Amino acid sequence: MSSLETLLSKPIPELRQLFLESSRPVPKGLLEALEVDRRHGAQQLAKRIRQRYRSNRSEGQRLHSLLRFEIELWTQGYSLVAGVDEAGMAPLAGPVVAGAVILPKNYKLRGLNDSKKILDESKREELAVQIKEDAVCWAVGFAEVEEIDRINIYHAGLLAMQRAFQRLSCCPDFVLVDARRIPNCASPQRGIIHGDALSASIAAASIVAKQPAMPTCWKSIAPIQGTVLPLIRVTRRQNIAGR
């Protein structure tokens, strides 16, 4: 009995577990054999595997398009491309938060998108954890409540982005910013309208800045509104460091 015949002799639930619910590659010829199998369950499994292929191909194309700006810069010799985005004001009139991320070249993380489009908080948290693990480096910056009152919300957002950029552990060769330009930025930069939906680096920064666990962290560190909160920087080889 050939290996393909051995697989086809297995119960459909076992095949589903092997080739649909796990990431195990489908052996050559198995999908076509399932499509002509007389068992209804086999045909349904083949249909779902085909759908997964189409979904993966579509997601791969979407993720590649998110790298259009990064690819352009990489080909020009800018190796370290940072994305910077401001996530807005935290709950209960808290600080303005911004993130900065440098992704590895050709980085494609399934589900990476503008944080505003990721409505599931657990999914956003999962992506944030993975981005931080994979990133060349990342940082978060804050503008405090009293700073918002003093310089207004727009300029506080710029300040938070500036702080996030300054706390990256490695200096970017180029910076992509969501819709704005960072004041006193030491690296060349480009503002991109709707950048969090068009650039993988900016999208990653928006997710890091909007991490759901942060409000709990702020509350435990600074229970009194207006208390200065730490600026956080983390790389693969570093622990969280306060200002």
Where in this protein do the model-derived segments appear?
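RNase H-like, Mg2+-dependent phosphodiesterase core
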Residues: M1-A82, M89-R243
